[in-house]
Design a protein with these regions (language model features):
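C-terminal beta-signal and adjacent terminal beta-strands/loops
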Residues: 662, 671-688, 705-709, 713-775
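Periplasmic N-terminal accessory/gating domains of Gram-negative outer-membrane beta-barrel systems
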Residues: 90, 109-176, 182-215, 232
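Surface-exposed extracellular loop regions of Gram-negative outer-membrane beta-barrel proteins
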Residues: 360-361, 407-416, 459-473, 505-550, ...
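Outer membrane beta-barrel strand-and-loop segments of large Gram-negative receptors
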Residues: 380-384, 424, 432-434, 537-543, ...
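Gram-negative outer-membrane beta-barrel transporters
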Residues: 570-573, 592-681
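A beta-strand signature from Gram-negative outer-membrane beta-barrel systems
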Residues: 96, 154-155, 199-242, 251-253, ...
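Signature of Gram-negative outer-membrane beta-barrel scaffolds
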Residues: 403-506, 519, 635-638
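Periplasm-facing N-terminal accessory domains of Gram-negative outer-membrane beta-barrel systems
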Residues: 20-109, 446
């Protein structure tokens, strides 16, 4: 009897233990049409309240719950929901594909976005703009080329650097304070044709995320923002050919399986052909002129095992401008990324990356058989290791490290002209490193919090000569260092925090704080980014930039998430901002560090966006009220002055109207305060030469900027294996002369006085593009 009782008790204990045990369901979620990973998809348990998870950047999910039989619901905006029933008595792996909704594929009254319903309310992160190329396909742009950077410039807190310029400013920061990544590789110049296009071919892009505050701890190296651009992986089920033919540019994309359902590739190219039109010119010097750019995106991936996957991706872009074989100017980016994904356990995901990045430019002048050539470059080799660890359903841990070896070649001059000697600025070397840890935690159904810290270090090293300067910029000494010898080591702790207080399922209040250190600096004498800007490291003289930002936002959804209201305020303090002493020169200056001065800055503002996400009529209104100010001891008599990116008012209106299955209308309107600029206050003569006299830094304003663009997309009847449409757009419909530049010259009608000459780039610019896809 005692034995039976003991066995019975043992059986009850074992049964209780089984019920107390927890098991993990994990796997990957992919697109059922092309096999690409789906990021940020939701997996919830039907039988358990507030129990769920989301996929990471590679479509991996992990959910740990007590043993039992459950219904798992898989959701993603733009896809049909899928449910599966699983008896969970052990750890299991379940990979799944979601099928795009028929309404989405037929382009009916549903707006495709990467943001799920209420996701803007519940996520801990704030000030994140996310979209896919599909979201922007009808927005009218210059020359008819879809451009993710131009679209970002229509959102709050992001300001265009000017007409025909792909540079952008985020919350009062400089153009060089944005970390721009393409498949994890830094892009040091994101512009083509001096800024008329960005380097991102939308046919090769999967999704785009811009972080303005509460920046996750895995990102480091820039003071203001992170633009993370991910390339498409290619269709692993069938071959596709797509492309577009425009007035000045065309593009072509080929993708398909390497082995069906196991691996895929994508090759996407784009080229302008303005130089072909110049060949029709009657002027001989124009016939030989070259003016074009090209870019090529390549990517391949392969599943080695059910737990291991390899990626190889690259980007190669080049601009070429030459005039009559007398002057040539070339610049371009090259990047490469090798990645290894591994599902380490049911709860841990690993990504190991080796990244290469290079930017270089060169211009040459030919005269009388002699030639002069000037060039510069920056090159990175980067090793990254990231882990995602799903601790439980309330805590998701992310940690890792990266090490970057920078090589700076600031400038070299080679000449066959007898009057000019060859000259080279010494190369510079640095090792940048970062270690981070971050947890994304949910506390009940009322609070989401993401907190973490990043340690960043920067080792400025030899081989090279380190100079020292006094307070006035005069060189006082120099010391030579051998290979890999530390000249100066900088390091910082960078805390990151984002919190979302969920007031209801329709509204939330968010706060964020982040500190960012920046060790690389772009030196420019112009008012906007150009290919000849110089990248320099933090050294024993050049100080790292530091940015501390606090932000608060209120988010509200209306009418079943059809309308979305976002309001945010922010304050940013900027330390060790860089400017130039009066008369400083950047061109082939081996002692440029002596011409730099350091100060502080502050940026603050209010941002508002009201968006309609569903229905035939969609779009948004965004408005930013902001200031960006700087203060330097040696500039402007030590008084605070507006930064060149200081724009008080910035308004954008974007509207898209789906008339029917065949026609879609779109329009954008932009207005913003003119840039702060420095103009001469007077002039004087020295030995007969007129010299301008400057007083207040950035004490004047360019005229206010405004522009209306309209577009029409015609969708032709699709065939089973063929889709095509025609996009017609007009840039600057009412042909307003927006000022690009102001120069000064002597007034011939009134000698002794100076008059201002305004130069505009574009008035009315029509464009037409034919797009197609062969399945």
């Amino acid at each position: 009897m005692k034995i039976k009782l003991t066995l019975f008790c043992f059986f009850i204990c074992c049964l209780s233990l089984v019920h107390a045990q927890k098991f993990t369901l994990s796997g990957t979620i992919k697109d059922g049409e092309n096999g690409e990973d789906i990021f940020d998809a939701t997996v919830v348990v039907k039988e358990l309240t507030n129990t769920g998870t989301k996929t990471n950047a590679y479509g991996f999910y992990s959910l740990t719950i007590p043993a039992g039989t459950y219904t798992f619901i898989y959701r993603m905006a733009g896809y049909d929901q899928k449910e599966i029933t699983v008896e969970l008595t052990e750890n299991k792996q379940h990979n799944l594909e979601l099928i795009p909704s028929k309404d989405i594929k037929n382009l009916q009254e549903v707006e495709v976005t990467a943001v799920k319903e209420n996701d803007n309310i519940t996520k801990s992160g704030m000030a994140v703009t996310t979209f896919t190329p599909k979201d922007i396909e009808t927005i009218p742009v210059l020359f008819g080329e879809k451009d993710i950077v131009k679209t970002l410039q229509l959102t709050p807190g992001v300001k265009a650097a000017g007409d025909g310029n792909a540079g952008f400013y985020v919350r009062g920061g400089g153009a060089d304070q944005n970390l721009v990544l393409l498949d994890e590789a830094p892009v040091y110049n994101a512009s083509h044709l001096l800024g008329f296009f960005s380097v991102f071919n939308s046919d090769a892009i999967k999704d785009v995320s811009l972080y303005k505050s509460g920046i996750p701890a895995q990102y480091g190296g820039r003071a203001s923002s992170v633009l993370d651009v991910k390339m498409r992986e290619g269709n692993n089920k069938r071959f596709n050919v797509s492309g577009g033919i425009g007035l000045i540019a065309s593009r072509l994309t080929v993708e398909g399986p390497i082995v069906k359902n196991k691996g895929s590739f994508i090759v996407s190219g784009r080229r302008t052909y303005m130089d072909l039109f110049l060949k029709a010119s009657r002027k001989p010097e124009l016939k030989s002129t070259k003016l074009y750019f090209y870019d090529l995106n390549l990517k391949a991936n392969y599943n080695i095992t059910s737990r291991d996957r390899l990626y190889l991706s690259g980007y190669f872009g080049r601009d070429n401008f030459s005039f009559n074989d007398e002057f040539g100017f070339k610049w371009g980016n090259g990047t490469g990324t090798i990645r290894w994904n591994r599902i380490v356990t049911e709860k841990m995901f690993s990504n190991t990356s080796f990244v290469f990045s290079n930017f270089n430019y060169a211009f040459d002048i030919t005269s009388g058989g002699s030639k002069l050539k000037v060039g510069a470059s920056i090159q990175d080799l980067n090793l990254k290791q990231d882990f995602d660890y799903f601790i439980n359903n309330s805590n998701s841990l992310k940690f890792g490290f990266n090490v970057i070896y920078h090589t700076f070649k600031p400038g070299e001059l080679k000449s066959t002209m007898s009057a000019i000697n060859n000259f080279k600025i010494d190369n510079q070397y640095a090792l940048e490193m970062g270690v981070y840890i971050q947890n994304d935690q949910k506390i009940g159904n009322w609070l989401s919090i993401m907190y973490g810290v990043r340690y960043s270090g920067f080792d400025y090293m030899g081989k090279g000569i380190a100079y020292s300067y006094d307070e006035k910029g005069k060189k006082t000494g120099e010391q030579e260092y051998g290979d890999f010898k530390t000249i100066k080591y900088h390091h910082f702790l960078e805390p990151r925090l984002s919190m979302s207080f969920i007031l209801s399922e329709k509204n939330s209040l968010k706060i964020a704080y982040n500190r960012n250190a920046q060790f690389l600096h772009q030196l420019s004498n112009s008012s906007s980014s150009s290919p000849t800007d110089i990248w320099v490291p933090s050294t024993n003289n050049v100080k790292p930039q530091i940015a501390d930002q606090v932000a608060m936002g209120y988010y509200r959804n209306f009418l079943d998430n059809m309308l979305v209201l976002t309001t945010e305020i922010y304050y940013k303090h900027l330390g060790n901002q860089i400017d130039y002493r009066n008369g400083a020169s950047l061109f082939l200056n081996n002692e440029i560090e002596g011409g730099l001065v350091y100060g502080t800055g502050q940026a603050y503002g209010f941002e508002l966006q009201f968006e309609k996400k569903k229905g035939k009529f969609t779009g948004w209104i965004s408005y930013t009220l902001s200031r960006s100010l700087r203060k330097f001891k040696d500039i402007n008599q030590g008084k605070q002055f507006p930064a060149r990116q200081d724009r008080i008012h910035d308004l954008s209106v974007v509207a898209m109207y789906r008339i029917n299955q065949k026609f879609a209308l779109s329009g954008t309107f932009v207005f913003y305060t003119g840039d702060a600029v420095t103009f001469p206050s007077g002039k004087y003569e020295i030995n007969g030469a007129v010299v301008p006299y400057y007083t207040e830094r950035n004490g004047y304003r360019m005229p206010n900027y405004h522009r209306l663009d309209l577009g029409l997309t015609v969708y032709f009847k699709d065939r089973p294996k063929f889709e095509h449409n025609l996009n017609v757009s007009i840039y600057n419909v009412y042909a307003h002369r927006n000022t690009f530049m102001i120069s000064f010259e002597e007034d011939k009608d009134n000698p002794g006085k100076t008059k201002a000459i305004q130069t505009s780039l574009f008035r009315l610019v029509p464009s037409i593009t034919y797009n197609f896809k062969i399945k």
